Structures are given as C-alpha cells and as structure tokens.
C-alpha cells in the first residue's frame, strides 16, 4: 500500500517536472529553437491549426528558424500567423521556405524572461509540494484506519520527503540551466 503511494507520488512529480520543462522550453532565449513556434496557430480552411501540422520547423543556425510549409498556398497565412504572434518575430518568405530571424535579446528583456522562468519554477515547486501533501494525507489516513503503524507512517513520510527533495532539486537545476542559457546568449 505504501509502495503504491510512493510510486504514484513519484509518477505525479515526474509529470509536474515534464510540464515545467515544456513551459520553460517555450520561453525564448537568443538561440533558435523549433519549439519556439509550437504555440502558433494558423488559419487553415476556417479553423485554427497548429503550425507544426502545416509545416516543418528547423533551426537553420543559432539565430534563424526555417519554416518549410507543406502547402504553397499557405505561405502567406503562416507568415501572417508568425508576424501577429506575441513573439515579436519578423518572418520573410523565400520560395516555399519562410525564414524567421531571431532578434538579439536586450539585457532588460533577459531579466524579464528570468523573472518569468523563476515564476514557472515556483509553480513547479508548489505543484510538487501539493503532491507531497496528498501523499502524506493518504499515509495519515492509512495510519488512522490502523492499516499501518505509527513507525511505518513516519518512515513513509520521510521517504516521501526524500522524493520531494529530489524533485525540488531537479526543478532548481532546470531553472539554473535556463537562467544560464538566457544570460549567456
């Protein structure tokens, strides 16, 4: 029973960590990353369609993304979607490829992005702590129902805390890496 709670806790914390990585990867650094354009929706036959379903996005070099549209008739719609996104990008088309140069980040913008990254990290930590609280509540319930002893309860809570500490440390490492990436480029 306790092992199931620990396993479930670890799986949920891993999902929180993956969600954090996903959120942070969308925050623009000076380096061109195809995931930067993942959130862009293109008007396609009257409905908003994710860009990655209509085009292939690759990093051409450190500061340029190349978007190869599958259907030539969509080039202007894709270009417009990138231009009107809140990413502040200025695409230019050349044949079937749209080049998206990334402007260098200003010092002020880097600091703003670091604040955003720290906020995302704090959300990740809160999520992990909430998962810990849920696990501890389940363990306390088992002890109240006399399914486990007080010693088993304490040991299980210590184990849950160790798992929590590991994941909080992983969040801190992810944040430190992203901050370094933002300041170095």
From Swiss-Prot:
Gene Ontology process terms (BP):
cytoplasmic translational termination
Keywords of this entry: Cytoplasm, Protein biosynthesis
Annotated SUPFAM superfamilies: Ribosome recycling factor, RRF
Gene Ontology CC, one term: cytosol
**Gene Ontology molecular function terms on file:** ribosomal large subunit binding
Q: Where in the cell is it found?
A: Cytoplasm
Q: Which InterPro entries match?
A: Ribosome_recyc_fac, Ribosome_recyc_fac_dom, RRF_sf
Q: Which NCBIfam families match?
A: frr (TIGR00496)
Q: Which family does it belong to?
A: Belongs to the RRF family.
| Function, as annotated | Responsible for the release of ribosomes from messenger RNA at the termination of protein biosynthesis. May increase the efficiency of translation by recycling ribosomes from one round of translation to another.
Q: What is this protein called?
A: Ribosome-recycling factor
């Amino acid at each position: 029973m306790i092992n199931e709670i620990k396993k479930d806790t670890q799986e949920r914390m891993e999902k929180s960590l993956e969600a954090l990585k996903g959120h942070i990867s969308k925050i623009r650094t000076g380096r061109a990353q195809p995931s930067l354009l993942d959130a862009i929706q293109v008007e396609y036959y009257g409905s908003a369609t994710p860009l990655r379903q209509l085009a292939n996005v690759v990093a051409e070099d450190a500061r340029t993304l190349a978007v190869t549209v599958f259907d030539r008739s969509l080039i202007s719609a894709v270009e417009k979607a990138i231009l009107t996104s809140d990413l502040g990008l200025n695409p230019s088309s050349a044949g079937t490829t749209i080049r998206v140069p990334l402007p260098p980040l200003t010092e002020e913008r880097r600091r703003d992005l670091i604040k955003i990254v720290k906020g995302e990290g704090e959300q990740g930590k809160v999520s992990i702590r909430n998962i810990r609280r849920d696990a501890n509540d389940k363990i306390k319930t088992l002890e109240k129902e006399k399914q486990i002893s007080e010693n088993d309860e304490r040991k299980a809570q210590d184990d849950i805390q160790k798992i929590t500490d590991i994941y909080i440390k992983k969040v801190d490492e992810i944040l430190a890496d992203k901050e370094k990436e933002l300041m170095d480029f």
